[in-house]
Structures are given as C-alpha cells and as structure tokens.
Amino acid sequence: MGARASVLSGGELDKWEKIRLRPGGKKQYKLKHIVWASRELERFAVNPGLLETSEGCRQILGQLQPSLQTGSEELRSLYNTIAVLYCVHQRIDVKDTKEALDKIEEEQNKSKKKAQQAAADTGNNSQVSQNYPIVQNLQGQMVHQAISPRTLNAWVKVVEEKAFSPEVIPMFSALSEGATPQDLNTMLNTVGGHQAAMQMLKETINEEAAEWDRLHPVHAGPIAPGQMREPRGSDIAGTTSTLQEQIGWMTHNPPIPVGEIYKRWIILGLNKIVRMYSPTSILDIRQGPKEPFRDYVDRFYKTLRAEQASQEVKNWMTETLLVQNANPDCKTILKALGPGATLEEMMTACQGVGGPGHKARVLAEAMSQVTNPATIMIQKGNFRNQRKTVKCFNCGKEGHIAKNCRAPRKKGCWKCGKEGHQMKDCTERQANFLREDLAFPQGKAREFSSEQTRANSPTRRELQVWGRDNNSLSEAGADRQGTVSFSFPQITLWQRPLVTIKIGGQLKEALLDTGADDTVLEEMNLPGRWKPKMIGGIGGFIKVRQYDQILIEICGHKAIGTVLVGPTPVNIIGRNLLTQIGCTLNFPISPIETVPVKLKPGMDGPKVKQWPLTEEKIKALVEICTEMEKEGKISKIGPENPYNTPVFAIKKKDSTKWRKLVDFRELNKRTQDFWEVQLGIPHPAGLKQKKSVTVLDVGDAYFSVPLDKDFRKYTAFTIPSINNETPGIRYQYNVLPQGWKGSPAIFQCSMTKILEPFRKQNPDIVIYQYMDDLYVGSDLEIGQHRTKIEELRQHLLRWGFTTPDKKHQKEPPFLWMGYELHPDKWTVQPIVLPEKDSWTVNDIQKLVGKLNWASQIYAGIKVRQLCKLLRGTKALTEVVPLTEEAELELAENREILKEPVHGVYYDPSKDLIAEIQKQGQGQWTYQIYQEPFKNLKTGKYARMKGAHTNDVKQLTEAVQKIATESIVIWGKTPKFKLPIQKETWEAWWTEYWQATWIPEWEFVNTPPLVKLWYQLEKEPIIGAETFYVDGAANRETKLGKAGYVTDRGRQKVVPLTDTTNQKTELQAIHLALQDSGLEVNIVTDSQYALGIIQAQPDKSESELVSQIIEQLIKKEKVYLAWVPAHKGIGGNEQVDGLVSAGIRKVLFLDGIDKAQEEHEKYHSNWRAMASDFNLPPVVAKEIVASCDKCQLKGEAMHGQVDCSPGIWQLDCTHLEGKVILVAVHVASGYIEAEVIPAETGQETAYFLLKLAGRWPVKTVHTDNGSNFTSTTVKAACWWAGIKQEFGIPYNPQSQGVIESMNKELKKIIGQVRDQAEHLKTAVQMAVFIHNFKRKGGIGGYSAGERIVDIIATDIQTKELQKQITKIQNFRVYYRDSRDPVWKGPAKLLWKGEGAVVIQDNSDIKVVPRRKAKIIRDYGKQMAGDDCVASRQDED
C-alpha cells in the first residue's frame, strides 16, 4: 500500500484529490484509484513502478492506446486514470478526466506535426519550390510553365461531359493546382462557349474584385525601392497585371497568392453555376423501389455537393436523410446497423438489395433448384467398351458412390430432393431425357418473337428451331450460316421441350433431345420394311425396329430420316432429324437490358388522330407492318390503348418501294429529355493512319434494340381502311422506333456496352462508332485483320445485330460518315452543286449545307452572300432571286470544287499548325496541317458576334473557334500563323478591356494583313476645334434633333424624323466629323455612342455607324471625351438647349448641381444620388468617380448578412488616440457610434442602455474585451433583458459585420473630417451619412430606411401570423363553375369581400364568395364506447 501511495508526493496528492471523475460531477479521484491502477497494471504484466514518473505514464499510455477500440470498459477506465496521473506529474492544470484526455490528445497531435514537419523538411531540402507551374530554372530565376494542352483538354471534356454538375468544382480545383491568374483565364476561355455560365462567373469575379479593393485600399505615396505594388482586384483576375507581376507576387517574401485568391473567386462562381445547373434539392433524392443502393448513394452525394450549406449541415444531412430517404428494404437493413455506421458498412450491407442484380440473384436461386443435375440418358448405337464415370448422389462429386461418401448425409431423396422418402422409394424413376427435373406440367411449344424474348426473358437456355423453308431437307452444313429467318419457334428449357409431330399420318407428342443420336418412338405401325436392332439406354438395352426414309413433320418443318420403334418410356426426336430442320441448342448471353423511359412529369401520351391516306399508301403500310409483326418489331393492340400517332408512307429515293414514316413530333414533346451520349461526329483528320481498315454498317440498327415494355403503349399507331370499310389496324412498337427522340441515345448507349468486351480483348484495334456506322482500323496484316472483323461480326450477331455484306466495305476507298477514306488520305464524298434557273429558300438551305460540308477540306469556300438571301421569315417554297454578289460567290465556289482536294491523317509525333487568311467582308479561311501543303483539314469563319466589330476582334474569335475544334479532334491546340503584326495586336489589346486568351502565335505576311484603320487619341488635341455634340428625340412622335456647338462659335442643328435618342447622338457625332478638319476633339454625353466608337469597329451592320467609321478613317487625329450632361464645359449647355427645344420632356440636368452639392457635403454613394435626384446611374457614378476622396476605393456593400431583427454587434475602434464605441444592427447595417472617454465597463453599459432605449435590442454580440465581459455590462444586459454573446470559434454570429463597419465608418470620417473641429462631431456626421446618405444592399434602401422597414415588417408578420393561425381553423366547401356537386373541405388561406383563396390538396384556387361555404373545423369526432357504431358492432 505504502509503495503504491508513494506514486504522488503530498502537494501532487492534494491536486489529484481535487480532480473530478466526470465534468460537473461530485465524485473526485482518491488514493484508492491509484492502488486499483497499479493492481490492474500487474494483471497486464506492466511494471507499476512506471506510475511514479510522467515519462513512465506516457509509456503506459502508448501501450494502452492501440487497444482502446476493442478493449473493455475496465481498460478505458485504466487509460483515463493514468492520463489524469500524467497531467498531475506534468503540472498541467485539469479539472476533470475529459479535460485531461483533451490535453493528452493535444500533446500527441503536436508531436505528430513536429515529426511530419521534420520529415517534410528533410525531404524538401533539395527542392526550391513545389508551386506548379512556377519553377526555378538553372539560373535561380522563377519562371512560368504554361498550362499544358492536355490539362486544358481534360478541363474541356469535364465541362462538356458533366455540364456544370457538382463534379466540375473538385476537377477544376485539381487541374488548376498552383496555377497563375493567366492560366486560370486560359482555362475559362477554353469553355467560353457556355455564355450564360461564363456571364454568371464574370459577375461573381467582378463582385469579389470590388470587395478586395474595398478591403485592401491603395497606400498613398510612392512604392519603396525593391518593393512590389500591391495587387488590385483586377490584377488578381489577370486583367490588368502581367504574367511577370503575377509570378512576382506569388514568389515574393511574404507571398501574395494571387492564383489561389482568384481560384477561390472562380470556385465561388462555379458554386452558383452548379446550383443553377443542378436545381434538384437534397430533400427530393429518394431511392426508387428497385434502384440499387449504390446508384442512390451516387445521386445523393452528387446533389449534396451542389447544396449551398456548411459542412456541419451536410454531415447532418448525410447522417439523417441518407437513411430516411432509402427504400423500405434498404432502410430496414440500415437501421439495424445502428447510428454510427460508416458509408462502407452501409454499402456492403445493402449490396444487391433491389434492382436488377437482386432480381438476377433470386432468379439464379430459382434456376439452381430447377436445374439440379439429374440422371442422364445417353442414347448411342453401340455401348460396347463404354466406361461410365461414377458420381456420388450425396455430395455430387465424381470418383465415388454415395455408400462410400464421407460427407454429411443430405436430407431427403437424392433423386428429386424432396423430404419424406429415400431415392429407392422415389416415384420419379423414369428416364429423364431432358436432363432437367419435371418442374412444369407438359405444354405446347410457344411462338416467341426474337424481340419479345430478348426484351422480356432473363438469362436463359433455349432450344431454337432455326427455320429456312419447309422443303429444305438437306443436312445442315456451312451453307446455312448466313441468312436466318427471325420467325422461328424458341422453346425455353424451363419445361420439357415437348412438341407435336406428324408421322405416318398420325399426330404424336415427342421430346426434342439434342443429346440423343437416334429418333425413337413408342409402338406404332409404319409403312415399309424394317430391320431389328438393340439400343442402350439408362434402364438397360431395348429391342427396336429400324425404319429408313420415313417422312416426319416437326414444327411445320419436314424431314426424312431413320426412325426406331420400340418400348421407349417417351418419344424422342434425336439429332439425326433435328439437324435437318436446323434446330440448335443456344446458350445466349444476357439480352440487351431495356432502358427505362418515362414521359415528362404531368404529361400523358399522344392522342393525335390519323389523317386519311390513299389506297396505295394503305396497301404499302399493311404489307410493311405485316412483315414487321412477323419479325417481332411491332405487335397488334386492341381498343384499350387510348394513344395514337399518325403514320404515312413515302416512296424511297430512285425506287418503287414504299417507306413507312411515323410522325412522332407529339410524342417527342411529351417524352423525357435524354443526354446525348456523343457530343459530335468523329472527324477523319483525327484518325491515325492504319495498315488495314474496314467499314461496317449495322443493319436495322434501331430495330435490334428493345423498347421499355411500359413505354410501348405510347408508340401506338393506326393503319386506316379505305372509306372506313373496317376499323383501323392498331399496332405498337416493341423496338426503338425511327424518328422518336430517345432512339439515338438509347441505341448509342446499348452499342457502347456491347462493343466494350471486344474493345478490352483487342486493345490494338481502333473502333470508331457513330450510330450504326463502324470504322475498324488496325496495324495487323490483312488476313489477321479480316479474322478479327469476323470475330467482331459474330460478337455483334450474338446480341442480335447484323452487319449486312451489302454494306461491309473491305477495300478502299471507304465511304464513312459522308467522307471518302483512302489508305493515306481522305476527302469528302463527291459534291455536285445543282444548276437551277430559279432558287427556293429550301434549295439555298441545301446548297449552303453542301458548301459548309465541303469547306472542311476545300479551302476558300464562302457562303456569306448566299446566307444573306435567307434573312427574315420566309416560306420554304418561296422563290428567292440571287443577288449579283451571291451569283459571284456561287461561281467562285463551283471553281473551287472542280479540282478534287484531299486531306491527310494525323501523326501524333508532329506539331499542329493552323494558318488563317482574311477573305474580306468579314469572312476568314483557315488550314490545319503538320507538313506544309498537306492539310489535315480546312475551314471557314464568318460569324459576327456583335452589330459592330473589327478585324482584330473577329480574328480572335476565329482563333478561339479553331483552338476549341482542335482540342475536340486532337486533344491539343495548334501553333497559329496569323496575318497581323505584333504592334497592331498590342495597340488594340492594351486598350481593350476584356481579357481574352490567345494561344501561341506568330506573324505571317499573307495579304491582306489585319490592321487598325484608325486610332483614338488618349489626350485632347491642342489647337484642334472642339465640337460639343448632343441629340434628343421624342418617344411618342419619333421626331428628333441632332447638333453641335464648337469652341470657335460655330453651331448647327438638323431636324430628324423616325429616330431614337441613341440614333440622334450618333447622328450628332457624324455631323461633327463631316464638318471638322483633319484633327478634331469631340465631347458627347452619350455612353452608348462612346461605347461603340471606343471599341474601334471597322465594319457594322448599322448604316449610320458605317458612315461614322468612314469619316474616322479619313481623319488624322480624333479625340473623343464623355462628360456627365455637359457639366462644367461651357459650350455643352448651349448645344443641349439647341437640341432639347420642343423635344425633351424631362431633363435631369437640374438635379446634377444639387447632387454634386450634396456629395461634396455627405459623399453619398451613387445609388443614393440616383434615387434622390432622379439621375441616370451613369451620371451619378461619374460624380462619385470625379470626387478625389471617393475614387480611392470601391464602395461598401450593405445588408449582405441576413440575421434576426433584434441582433446587434458592438466593438471598440480607435482613431486619433480616442476610443469610438460602435454598434451595428446586423440585419440592416444601421450604425450607432459615440466617442467614449475610456474603454471601461461603466461607459459601455451606459452606451448599451441608451441603445436599448432607442431600438428593440434582443441580443448583443461582442468580442472578449474586458469592458464587454465586465459585471457592469452583464448587469445592464440582465436589467434590459438582453442576451449577451461573445466571439467564440464556430459561432455563426462572427464579428465580421462590425469589423467591416468600423472600416467603413473610418473611411467616411476621413471624407468629412475637414468639415468638423472635433472628432466626436465628425463621428456623428459620419453616422448620419452612413445611415441616411448611402443606399444599396437589400431592397436598395439606406441603412436608416432598412432598419425601420425590418422592425415594422417584424411586427406586421407577427400579427399576421396570429391571424393566419386563427384563419386556418376554418374549412371551406365550394362549387366549381359548372359542376353542381359541393367539393371540399379545403383549407381557408384568405377571405376577401368578393372571393376566398383556398387550398385543396396541393392546388391553390380563388373561389367567388357566393360559391363557398365557410365552417369552423372542430376536429374529427371519435366514436366512444357507448356510441351507435360500437353498439352495431356488438350486434
């Protein structure tokens, strides 16, 4: 005892006995706990002496910790005791066991981190930087490695395939690891085609950049030598910063990780986009009754990633909703696992529950019961020298019999498996020729269409009679492998294959036995001579009579052969006759799974009437449908199907045959949407050159894939009769119909699954699959290649896909996807342009389509003038006269197409080069090649993305189109050769605001070169005449004026008709350009006009803008400036008076002076001025921009945190050595602030009581400053009934709002400080400005308006809530317009004078007051023990 007590000294023992066993508990540690621990350690063979030191305790803890997971409660108690003892030895103050365990965990984590850091340090000594893509070169400089085409390709593929689903965000994060803003912009520009998403992203980036500028103001004064300037928001976004600057910031000491910051902004934007593209809520994700648990979990987590919630909320969703929304089967299993189950345990437990896998397993179990190996009768002509392998009836193994079996005895009969008797007493002793148990009663062989069995049956074994024709009696040989009719009987082996045969004029039932050599029938008389014979069977040898050349009819097929007659227990048709009729035993692999299809929610199938058809069309349709029905593609239906789609027939091209067409437009509108598996067609320029090539075509592609059984009814159609002689013949599709929107996607999906095993087995063979066209290429010798092709054809045939010889191309040139492929080159299939005297709209559309197709290899093709002919809404048959330009364009294209042109195949080892030439009139042509004059492909670009553009902008768009096209075809971008000089390029892009990615390029001197036709000056031109221009128009009369006044006293006004304000502004600029010299200054107040001209367009769809461009090109120098409504520029007020007379109704000019005066006093933001003085936003913004005190930073955003109306945040800030106590109303951004003498509890409590006297304060949130935690403040809060919260980690009410308001307040104080003598005056002025002179945020109010609105709304909603709870106690019975029956009861939502609003189920309706009866809801009356209902029950 003494030895054990010596573990702790006196002082330590006192500490030990003060520590509680549990947090908040009464029991404390005693000496007995140390005695117990030392005894337990002896039990575990651990030295108890270790307890005397902290190091010994640490060693014991290290030994015990691994066993905690599996150990008993005693072991855990021992660990806890030693942990507390360790803390006492180490003099760590702890109050209870939990605190001691936390301290130990903290120490262990620290030691782990140190070890990891040490390991990382030793590993990283050799590396200078791991920050891809910025690396250190041999000279020690930090250089940038551009983002690779492979990474860009991966990113493009992700976006194209996932379409901004939640997976896009982690993928973007992974691909952009360590990237610079320039790399990130490159990634964004490669997916620039997604306009809506990119616009959302751009807005988010702009918002974040403005917020960055607000929080990081520019330091005044010059930058110190050796220091870098601080990045602005636009620098981080890569718009106004160079690559070198970005590298400098990222590698600076300390670094500014601009790449990571920009990446964070982009991810914020991507989150918004994902939310838009994935609108499904996590609450809507429920597991279907047959959906596998794995698929449900995939959907659940995919939607969870798109949810905008914190990680804690997401964890809660996973723990509760995942189980809650599972189907009943899985939910039962999941609940049994308990609350702490991991996802792995859940998925393992629910594996295979529900879904096709579960179904297949149940089916397999059923089959295993039916198909137990039974006795086998082998019938052979001669059994001599045959040795039978012995097989045990008990365990099923070969080599011993049941009597000698050592395995446990199997219950029941060894023959039939039933209990209650042994095998010797079994009644089922007859020879079983089927090798299956007699599981089903005898029945006739049923006719199944190939399509139905494929679509409906699970994994199956089938006996199939492959019929050719009734007269075919020759032995089946190699000549029979080719064509096979699809209307043969299929006899499944779920029951014995008994069929009716006709022999000697008699009908008999016989068993089809593929294991018997001969045909044996029971006693009967047959004509002709016979000879005696002995045959062996399971029951021994039997004597039979042999008849030769006997005619037998089996399943409608005739055969002549040898028949044996004798005492057989069952009639057997053996292989000697089965081979003649083409019978085979098939083991087909699982059929193509049908893809489940549904209609759009809330829609029903099509019910479109059949229109009348001519007699020849009806006859043709009847013939086609009869044949299709035989093949199982369609089935007849009765009148119970209410759906219908019109059907008609057209003649095939160059043929007398008819083709059936079904007008599925209405069904397509109602069918669910499908995701197209392939986003485009493969291009021959992307093919690698192969030694051997074959092109195959899948025959009747769609008709080989079954349609979902539940969807077939919607494909119903009717063939009418002439003069309605009889009711129409009704059919529905069993397979994918031509013309239905789901057929391409389902077929492609099925085909991909079928080809997958062949692709895996033959990785060296390239298979390009697009719909029913297959391109197969390999580097094998032609003989081996063709063997592989036959294997592929057989593989497809097993799944029911035929590849007709007619379309099997073995020799070049191969016709594929509209292309002509040769061994070493490719081209488009010959194109013949029609010669016509008159052209209809339809003719021109087809012509443009042909030319576009040809342009991918014929360089220089143009279609701009031909497309102009199609502008406007015209009927397809309308004749369009060709313009002179269009005729010339068509003639040029004919010349180009006269000479055949070929493209070559892609060589992965060589670089891609793209060269672009300008053709004029906004048209561009390009060639992509690897070797000069050997084009991979060519193309054209002629798209104008805006009304006004210039060549540089169009060239950029063309480059981006070619780069995207290259990534799709080859997975990388080419090097570009562009007809533009670097100087021209720089002159344009340094001024142009939009950041655009351009890949690597070089100048190539190919006339005509791209140039800028004019440039605007950046500063006013000294000595040039200045024109003040303006225009105005009346909206109602469309009358307007445009004019100018110059600084030299000239003026001019021109009246205009049928015009707009925008046109008059442009007209005024045109007048100034016309009447001015070679150098001119122009001042306008039109942002619209400024925006057009500053982009330096050189072509425009607008005639007026084109005229302005002509004038600009003639000038030597032009300076264009904008002013807000001519403020401060003498001549402009005159011109405004000139053009406004009798035109403008409302002028905002008067408001500008007042707004400027107010801004000089209060420095209001632009929203407040626009609202108070009725100014256009652009004018209000200009006033703010011209103020030297306001243009330093972006303005603050208010009202962005949505919180309860009673919550305030308090904080102290310091300025000029004084303390300012600030309170902010979180929901509105309203501020109360005061300069206090000292930062004490007394002053804070007094301020808090004043605040509570003015506003309803429910909660105050502060930091842990001594003045806020003082008893005085606590007493004040208690008295005023205010709840006090402090800034603890993970508290959702962070101090962020008050911190930003402090900065905002200081900023405003800085703006007005020179207007006040004392700081306390400036503080109150700043509070006034903030609360009443700044608008923005929620509702566009000022903070003062917003707090009043929030409090008033809170009172109203509380009152309204009381009214709602009262009104919900009423129920309404109502009548619809013409229905006399009273409906209801419905819930009363609102009662007005003339009508009531009610909710009936989920529908909300408005019912006139006269058609509604309102009654109070007293609840359901329950039947009591003595009520009439109970008495009736007793009777």
Curated annotation (Swiss-Prot):
- What residues does Mg(2+) 2 bind to? 1030, 1065, 1085, 1136
One Pfam family assigned to this protein is Gag_p17
Sequence segments annotated as region (Disordered): 106-128, 444-464
Query: DNA-binding region spans which residues?
Result: 1370-1417
Residues marked Cis/trans isomerization of proline peptide bond (site): 221-222
Map motif Nuclear localization signal onto the chain: 26-32
Enumerate the spans annotated as Integrase catalytic domain. 1201-1351
Q: Which residues carry this modification: Phosphotyrosine?
A: 132
Q: How is its activity regulated?
A: Protease: The viral protease is inhibited by many synthetic protease inhibitors (PIs), such as amprenavir, atazanavir, indinavir, loprinavir, nelfinavir, ritonavir and saquinavir. Use of protease inhibitors in tritherapy regimens permit more ambitious therapeutic strategies. Reverse transcriptase/ribonuclease H: RT can be inhibited either by nucleoside RT inhibitors (NRTIs) or by non nucleoside RT inhibitors (NNRTIs).
Spell out the PANTHER family in the cross-references.
ENDOGENOUS RETROVIRUS GROUP K MEMBER POL PROTEIN, RNA-DIRECTED DNA POLYMERASE-RELATED
Note down the stretches annotated as region Interaction with Gp41: 7-31
Query: Which residues are involved in binding Zn(2+)?
Result: 1159, 1163, 1187, 1190
Protein name per the record? Gag-Pol polyprotein
Motif Nuclear export signal: positions: 16-22
**Biological process (GO) annotations?**
DNA integration; DNA recombination; establishment of integrated proviral latency; proteolysis; symbiont entry into host cell; symbiont-mediated activation of host apoptosis; symbiont-mediated suppression of host gene expression; viral genome integration into host DNA
UniProtKB keywords: Activation of host caspases by virus, AIDS, Aspartyl protease, Capsid protein, DNA integration, DNA recombination, DNA-binding, DNA-directed DNA polymerase, Endonuclease, Eukaryotic host gene expression shutoff by virus, Eukaryotic host translation shutoff by virus, Host cell membrane, Host cytoplasm, Host endosome, Host gene expression shutoff by virus, Host membrane, Host nucleus, Host-virus interaction, Hydrolase, Lipid-binding, Lipoprotein, Magnesium, Membrane, Metal-binding, Modulation of host cell apoptosis by virus, Multifunctional enzyme, Myristate, Nuclease, Nucleotidyltransferase, Phosphoprotein, Protease, Repeat, RNA-binding, RNA-directed DNA polymerase, Transferase, Viral genome integration, Viral nucleoprotein, Viral penetration into host nucleus, Viral release from host cell, Virion, Virion maturation, Virus entry into host cell, Zinc, Zinc-finger
User: Mutating residue 9 to A: effect?
Assistant: Loss of ability to fuse with target cell membranes and infect host cell
Annotated region (Interaction with membrane phosphatidylinositol 4,5-bisphosphate) at 73-77
Can you list the GO cellular component terms from the UniProt entry?
Answer: host cell; host cell nucleus; host cell plasma membrane; host multivesicular body; membrane; viral nucleocapsid; virion membrane
Q: Which residues form the active site?
A: 513 (for protease activity)
Q: Does the keyword Lipid biosynthesis apply?
A: no
List the PROSITE patterns.
ASP_PROT_RETROV (PS50175), ASP_PROTEASE (PS00141), INTEGRASE (PS50994), INTEGRASE_DBD (PS51027), RNASE_H_1 (PS50879), RT_POL (PS50878), ZF_CCHC (PS50158), ZF_INTEGRASE (PS50876)
What region holds the RNase H type-1 domain? Answer: 1021-1144
Q: Where is the signal peptide?
A: none
Q: Which parts of the sequence bind Mg(2+) 3? A: 1211, 1263, 1299
Task: Give the ZnF (CCHC-type) ranges.
Answer: 390-407, 411-428
